[in-house]
Amino acid sequence: MARSKRTIKMQIEYDGTGYSGWQRQPGDVVTVQGEIERVLERIMQEPVSIDGAGRTDSGVHARRQVASFATCSPMPLGRLIYSANSLLPSTIRINAMRQAPESFHARFSATSREYRYFLLEHPSAIDSRFAGCSHGKPDVGAMNRLALMLIGTHDFAAFSKETPDQYGTLCTVTAARWYRSGRFHVFRIEANRFLRSMVRFLVAGMIEVGMGRLEEGAFARMLESGHRPPKLKPADAAGLFLWKVRY
């Protein structure tokens, strides 16, 4: 008798340093998704394909990534999560696992994602694994004026690394601001969806304005025109975290 399938929802945190992003890639490329699938397949002795709410880039971290997969295994989830965490690298941790409705999909059921970028004013031997650096004191007031421009529905083509897919380049941002937390300037942004490297390009542009190397009007024109200057490179991946996913 065939066993019925269950949909499992996981909450995952990871240090993205040393991984070629979230998404599985062919060959021997090490990714977060690939590591989790490898471990789950070993435990349950069946093929596993997981879907993540956010496809983080190489070097980007996650505090609360959400992923889902379907399985025919009857293994109790308490045993499964314990076994998985004992086999996963120390830089990946499944913090929760529960059965979800059959229709649940970690990516397509999500209503919004929140990212946070941590920025230091000066390099740090301790914190640089989880922060970018502006190499000086930025004008956070100017950066917050730019953050206000982002709220609403806009075409973020200028702040994306990829060509438009079938979903286009329109994103609806519901929150965006800089705030101080100890040594860090932190940028919090929430939207219904994000383009590839979008947050890192936005942060890079805001840092350029904050450090006086780019005018606020030039940033606004990038947003309006869909074009960015070739010299603008994405901010260091080390500072970016997928912070929360809402359903």
Swiss-Prot record:
Signal peptide boundaries: none
HAMAP family: TruA
Family to which this protein belongs: Belongs to the tRNA pseudouridine synthase TruA family.
Keyword terms, alphabetized: Isomerase, tRNA processing
Annotated organism of origin: Chlorobaculum tepidum (strain ATCC 49652 / DSM 12025 / NBRC 103806 / TLS)
InterPro entries found in the cross-reference section: PsdUridine_synth_cat_dom_sf, PsdUridine_synth_TruA, PsdUridine_synth_TruA_a/b_dom, PsdUridine_synth_TruA_C, TruA/RsuA/RluB/E/F_N
Pfam families linked to this entry: PseudoU_synth_1 (PF01416)
Keyword Cell cycle set for record: no
Function, as annotated: Formation of pseudouridine at positions 38, 39 and 40 in the anticodon stem and loop of transfer RNAs.
Active site: D57 (nucleophile)
Name by which UniProt lists this protein: tRNA pseudouridine synthase A
Encoding gene (name): truA
Source organism, top-level taxon: Bacteria
An MF annotation (GO) of this entry: tRNA pseudouridine(38-40) synthase activity
Quaternary structure, from the entry: Homodimer.
The keyword tRNA processing belongs to this UniProt entry's keyword annotation: yes
